Amino acid sequence: SIMIDHEEITKMRRSKMAVFRRNNIGLIFQDFNLLESLNVKDNILLPLILENRIEDSEEKLKQIAEVLSIADIMGKSVTDISGGQKQRVAIARALINTPQIILADEPTGNLDSKSTENVMEYLVDINRKFKITLVMVTHDSYAASFCDKVILLKDGIQFLEIEKNNKSNSTFLKDIYELLKQIGGE
């Protein structure tokens, strides 16, 4: 069973689940999923536009854009921005509905090492500033080192868990590598 905000989501009807997801869960994908026909601002606001909830969005948009350092690219086409900027736009879109939880599927998979570091720092900042739970799927140990807790799955089953416990990212990364070495991982 999966409980979010005292709701058993696995037992919801499909229509209720869709509304619940739109209102409570933000999604970040590896491949950005931005619409090239829209500029940065419209890509971020798209979930609100589709829900007819565009009123009072400007202040929220401004706050998110400042946190993610994308305020200066709002009018640009998404075809004219870097991969790291595209991922920050995708993160902003996931935040615009003020979700309780963000599910991130390999959010750094298409990024270079510097952009990976930047995106992970933004995600940590968002987690702390907005008090949003972030669940990330990754095969990247470096990206995982930014997390508070790492859960290893094998064949879809949890088999190991390691917590950061206020360690630095570099120390936690060494712990992750050591754990993977012990279990025969890469």
Give residue ranges: language-model regions.
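Conserved ABC ATPase "signature" region
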Residues: 8, 56-73
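Hydrophobic anchor residue at the start of the ABC signature
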Residues: 91, 119
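Short coil-to-helix segment of the ABC ATPase nucleotide-binding domain corresponding to the Q-loop/switch region
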Residues: 38-45
